[in-house]
């Protein structure tokens, strides 16, 4: 082990003898008896194994037994990581520096003790395809790429319009070109090392940010590809459901539930699938909010095998000018042929 203080935790003194790691009480850990051994904290940079660290502490005047005790206390408190030297060595300097906040966040959020290495490795191995590359879709693509996902492709051959432009997505130079090409350039700006090629291979996850044609939904179900819906319009943002084919409510289940509540829903849906209001009531902030939450749900699935993000059998929704996202539950529908209802 190469002990390293968890990145993102600032050491602060509570008094002359008590050192606190982290500022917010929801993350912070305080240890007493640190006054005479505080020098060891500056050595927790991951450059030494435990034996080398104890030797270095002795050079700073900290007895070996005291140094070993402090390391044990810090490890038990969950503020140490085993420095992921192999991961760092395999990343170019700029990429490593850019992904440092991602690693720091993963280390604190999941507490795996490896500095976020295994989770980032999962992200770098993942392939996500985003259908739709307008305001929301292009932002999703860049957010995922910047978060460490190694392969992000967009599918949207339509020409980019001025209303598609957004700070984290398409730019003025993309106008008139296929939106998917503009999204690929946006990904390259955010994370040049990320692949945007799409050879038709099955992705690990599909994100649907526009109207979903029945043949696409059916193909995803047949191929057992997890897929997440994300939509913003009418001054409303909706993220979900996250469909795990055959295991959770699918898009058809949701539409059947809506039809149960409103018998005219199938007629409305058929029209909305092939037409839309212009301009869309999806301002820059709503698009970014929806894209950010959709990206978070996608990463929740990628980061943990067998994870059940909150959008499984549900949606997260915000209705402007409200600020609060609320969850709606969508159980599998008994009349849907997707088979999820039998898994419950």
Predicted features, each with a name:
Residues 1-344:
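Adenine nucleotide-associated cytosolic modules
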């Amino acid at each position: 082990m190469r002990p390293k203080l968890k990145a993102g935790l600032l050491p602060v003194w509570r008094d002359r003898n008590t050192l606190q790691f982290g500022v917010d009480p929801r993350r912070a850990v305080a240890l007493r008896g640190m006054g005479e051994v505080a020098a060891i904290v500056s050595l927790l940079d991951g450059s030494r194994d435990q034996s080398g660290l104890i030797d270095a502490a002795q050079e700073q005047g900290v007895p070996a037994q005291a140094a070993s005790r402090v390391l044990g206390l810090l490890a038990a408190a969950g503020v140490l990581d085993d420095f992921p030297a192999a991961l760092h060595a395999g990343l170019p300097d700029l990429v490593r520096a850019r992904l440092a906040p991602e690693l720091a966040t993963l280390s604190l959020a999941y507490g795996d003790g490896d500095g976020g290495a295994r989770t980032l490795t999962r992200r770098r191995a993942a392939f996500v395809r985003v259908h739709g590359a307008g305001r929301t879709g292009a932002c999703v693509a860049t957010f995922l790429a910047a978060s460490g996902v190694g392969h992000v492709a967009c599918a949207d051959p339509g020409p980019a319009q001025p209303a598609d432009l957004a700070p984290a997505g398409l730019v003025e130079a993309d106008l008139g070109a296929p939106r998917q090409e503009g999204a690929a350039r946006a990904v390259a700006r955010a994370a040049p090392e990320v692949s945007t090629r799409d050879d038709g291979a099955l992705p690990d996850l599909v994100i649907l940010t526009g109207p979903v044609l029945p043949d696409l939904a059916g193909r995803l179900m047949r191929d057992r590809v997890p897929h997440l819906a994300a939509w913003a319009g009418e001054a409303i943002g909706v993220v979900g459901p996250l469909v795990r084919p055959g295991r959770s409510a699918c898009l058809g289940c949701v539409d059947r539930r809506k039809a149960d509540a409103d018998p005219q829903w199938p007629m409305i849906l058929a029209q909305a699938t092939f037409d839309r209001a212009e301009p869309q009531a999806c301002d820059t902030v709503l698009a970014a909010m929806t894209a950010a939450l959709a990206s978070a749900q996608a990463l929740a699935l990628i980061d943990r095998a067998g994870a059940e993000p909150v959008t499984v059998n549900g949606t997260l929704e915000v209705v402007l000018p409200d600020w609060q996202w609320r969850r709606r539950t969508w159980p599998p529908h008994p009349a849907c042929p997707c088979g999820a209802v039998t898994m419950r």
